[in-house]
């Protein structure tokens, strides 16, 4: 069993309020959950209007499948025109960690 985590650091477009920020972040989180069956949430930069951090976690039987799912998640977020992907952090943990 392998657990994978992926964190996205995002720069949002012309956002002036936290309400506007939620309107950008919520659809991304929902799409990650729906398309890839992962746990996803806004995990950081909660009080900043133009920045967002989204965290994703997945559990799989093997590392290859875990990497495949995380790669798909990264492609989905990178392909969103309303956000700029500044950085990603990926970690894989197996049963021995």
Residue ranges of each PLM-predicted region?
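Short, charge-patterned binding micro-sites
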Residues: 41-62
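N-terminal first-folded block
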Residues: 1-39
């Amino acid at each position: 069993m392998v657990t994978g985590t992926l964190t996205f650091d995002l720069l949002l477009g012309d956002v002036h309020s936290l309400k506007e920020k939620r309107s950008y972040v919520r659809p991304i989180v929902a799409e990650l959950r729906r398309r890839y069956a992962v746990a996803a949430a806004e995990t950081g930069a909660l009080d900043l209007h133009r920045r967002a951090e989204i965290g994703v976690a997945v559990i799989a039987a093997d590392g290859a499948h875990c990497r495949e799912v995380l790669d798909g998640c990264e492609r989905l977020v990178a392909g969103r025109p309303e956000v700029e992907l500044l950085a990603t952090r990926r970690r894989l943990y197996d049963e021995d960690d």
